[in-house]
From Swiss-Prot:
Protein name: Cytochrome c'
PTM remark: Binds 1 heme c group covalently per subunit.
This protein's record includes keyword Secreted: no
InterPro entries tied to this protein: Cyt_c/b562, Cyt_c_II, Cyt_c_prime
GO molecular function: electron transfer activity; heme binding; iron ion binding
Organism: Halomonas halodenitrificans (strain ATCC 12084 / NCIMB 8669)
One Gene Ontology term, aspect cellular component: periplasmic space
Chain positions recorded as heme c binding sites: 10-11, 65, 122, 125-126
GO BP field: electron transport chain
SUPFAM superfamilies documented for this protein: Cytochromes
Function comment: Cytochrome c' is the most widely occurring bacterial c-type cytochrome. Cytochromes c' are high-spin proteins and the heme has no sixth ligand. Their exact function is not known.
Secreted keyword on record: no
Length: 132
């Protein structure tokens, strides 16, 4: 695949993940009313797509590489691929845990905490590997 295609792919996949995370975060923060069915749908969707974007982070697709696409993916990813993969795994595990908690019928108070853990896993990667 061309670098441009890989960048567009991963940006789209990350956008899908953000779309799923948004309402759960809003519910967890009390900005919108908790809706168990919507929350469950979003949690399961997030877990289902959590593995998607990472294959789009390929050689030649980071900031400073020779492509014509705007990207926030820092060159640091290439310098610390192992750290980047660890962040991916943490996110995937946190998202899977959230979906499992929903399936297990956990109380909203526990789900709220787990949404926080998912968000923290997003932030941990963004802080190190995404441009401001």
């Amino acid at each position: 695949a061309e670098p441009e295609d890989a960048i567009h792919y991963r940006q789209s996949a990350l956008s899908v993940m953000g779309w799923q995370m948004g309402p759960m975060g809003a519910m967890a923060q009390g900005d919108i009313e908790y809706d168990a069915d919507e929350f469950a749908t979003r949690a399961n969707n997030l877990a289902a797509v959590a593995h998607l974007p990472w294959e789009g982070f390929t050689e030649g697709t980071l900031q400073g590489d020779d492509h014509g696409v705007e990207t926030d993916a820092l060159a640091d990813i290439g310098d610390d691929w192992e750290g980047f993969e660890e962040r991916q795994e943490t996110f995937k595990q946190e998202a899977a845990t959230l979906a499992q908690m929903v399936d297990d019928g956990e109380e909203f108070s526990a789900l709220r905490r787990q949404v926080g853990a998912v968000g923290k896993s997003c932030k941990g990667c963004h802080d190190d590997f995404r441009a401001e």
